[in-house]
Curated annotation (Swiss-Prot):
Residues 54-122 bind DNA. Its main location: nucleus. Keywords: Activator, Calmodulin-binding, Cytoplasm, Differentiation, DNA-binding, Nucleus, Sexual differentiation, Transcription, Transcription regulation. It comes from the Eukaryota. The gene is SRY. The keyword DNA-binding applies. SUPFAM superfamilies: HMG-box (SSF47095). Residues 31-54, 119-139 are annotated as: Disordered. The keyword Lipoprotein does not apply. This is Sex-determining region Y protein. GO terms for molecular function: calmodulin binding; DNA-binding transcription activator activity, RNA polymerase II-specific; RNA polymerase II cis-regulatory region sequence-specific DNA binding.
Length: 216
């Protein structure tokens, strides 16, 4: 007669994790009269204790791995449960369909017994509670790092803005520092001086380019 372990629920998604506890949990005998200590289903909302939950029937892999786990643990006392589980999973894949067939039949029988005993049973997986997200403090270091990131992403915008601001400040200072009673007679002289310098620069540039002076 096969035995089941009164442990965690066995779903395909978590069976690799659940088989780690088979060597530790107490086992119970399956009987045809349904006298095993199964509990009624509470809906799985997490408010009731684990003793009020109905355990899922074992699948073929769990049926096969119970005795195999004990055997591997006895042969390798130093092997950890995670290593044993990996080995059992590999050994199960290496079995042929004919070798797996008896365990599939036993798992089907256990499901039928479970369905007859709990006709309204519905599996409710346990959900992990969500952790609240921690809010970051908006201190000066965070603001500085955010400004640095934005400056890295948009360097030209920041540089152009700084240049425009600097130029506007310089023009403002120059406008306030210059006297208001500038004589209008100085303007033609400044214009002639600027024109002379510009003409000299153009002649020098033409001489360097063509090897002869450019007549204007």
């Amino acid at each position: 007669m096969f035995r089941i372990v009164n442990g965690e629920d066995y779903s395909p998604a978590v069976q690799q994790r659940n088989i780690l506890d088979f060597g530790k949990a107490p086992s119970l005998l399956w009987t045809d009269n349904g006298s095993s200590n199964d509990r009624c289903d509470t809906g799985g909302n997490g408010r009731e204790s684990g003793q009020d939950r109905v355990k899922r029937p074992m699948n073929a892999f769990i049926v096969w791995s119970r005795d195999q786990r004990r055997k591997v643990a006895l042969e390798n006392p130093q092997m950890q449960n995670s290593e044993i589980s990996k080995r059992l999973g590999y050994d199960w894949k290496m079995l042929t369909e004919a070798e797996k067939q008896p365990f599939f039949e036993e798992a089907q029988r256990l499901r039928a017994m479970h369905r007859d005993k709990y006709p309204g049973y519905k599996y409710h997986p346990r959900r992990k509670p969500k952790r609240p997200q921690e809010s970051l403090p908006a201190d000066s270091s965070v603001l500085c790092s955010r400004t640095h990131i934005e400056e890295t992403l948009y360097p030209f915008t920041y540089k152009d803005g700084c240049a425009k601001a600097t130029r506007s400040r310089m023009e403002s200072q120059l406008s306030h520092s210059q006297p208001t009673n500038i004589s209008s007679s100085l303007l033609p002289q400044e214009h002639r001086s600027s024109w002379t310098i510009l003409r000299h620069n153009r002649v020098t540039q033409a001489t360097q380019t063509c090897g002869r002076p450019l007549l204007l």
